[in-house]
Amino acid sequence: MAVSPKINRREHILQCLAQMLETNPGQRITTAKLASEVGVSEAALYRHFPSKARMFEGLIEFIEESLLSRINLIMDDEKDTMKRCQLVLQLLLIFAERNPGISRVLNGDALLGENERLRSRISNLFAKIETQLKQILREKTLREGKGFNLDEAILANLLLAFAEGRIAQFVRSEFKLKPTTHFDEQWRFIQHQLLQS
């Protein structure tokens, strides 16, 4: 007799939610639709998550854990300022591209009409990433003896706005316009401009 692996129902619910966000762009996901997709009753959903907001929080926790842990690895492994910035931006874009449904959460599109604390959490995540970029840029002076002519906070904001814009285009195009398209060429241009400042 074959033993089937035990399904982690909580993870399965989150995977179905992410899949529905991808396959139903621009549409609101109801708990009734999600329960049908998962193959359980709405009551069964609520045994694992007390509310739909908690389901979205589960996705946001996955996003935070995935991105912030990888950014820490970049910080440990790479010492060059420009390479660090490139890798952080590339991480954001590749993560969004590989997780189209979740990119709607990053973009805020899937959170319209949902609990305000969800949008606040995504805003806080982007604030942490911007702070990390600012720190990377500030360390250039310490590591290389030369900083930038423009304030690092302004530059960090510009870099993050670039990544957020690419993610917004991806969501708006219903996942046709990949965030990483032309990234290498765009990064070379951005890097050249940063080094000139």
Swiss-Prot record:
Keywords attached to this entry: Cell cycle, Cell division, Coiled coil, Cytoplasm, DNA-binding
Stored Gene3D superfamilies: Tetracycline Repressor, domain 2
Disulfide bonds: none
An annotated GO cellular component: cytoplasm
Pfam families: SlmA-like_C, TetR_N
Coiled coil regions, renumbered to chain: 109-136
SUPFAM superfamilies: Homeodomain-like
Residue ranges of every copy of the HTH tetR-type domain listed in the record: 7-67
GO biological process: cell division; negative regulation of division septum assembly
Main location (coarse class): cytoplasm
Residues within the DNA-binding region(s): 30-49
Molecular function as annotated in GO: sequence-specific DNA binding
Domain of life: Bacteria
Places the protein is found: Cytoplasm, Nucleoid
Function, as annotated: Required for nucleoid occlusion (NO) phenomenon, which prevents Z-ring formation and cell division over the nucleoid. Acts as a DNA-associated cell division inhibitor that binds simultaneously chromosomal DNA and FtsZ, and disrupts the assembly of FtsZ polymers. SlmA-DNA-binding sequences (SBS) are dispersed on non-Ter regions of the chromosome, preventing FtsZ polymerization at these regions.
Subunit structure: Homodimer. Interacts with FtsZ.
Family designation: Belongs to the nucleoid occlusion factor SlmA family.
Name of the molecule in the record: Nucleoid occlusion factor SlmA
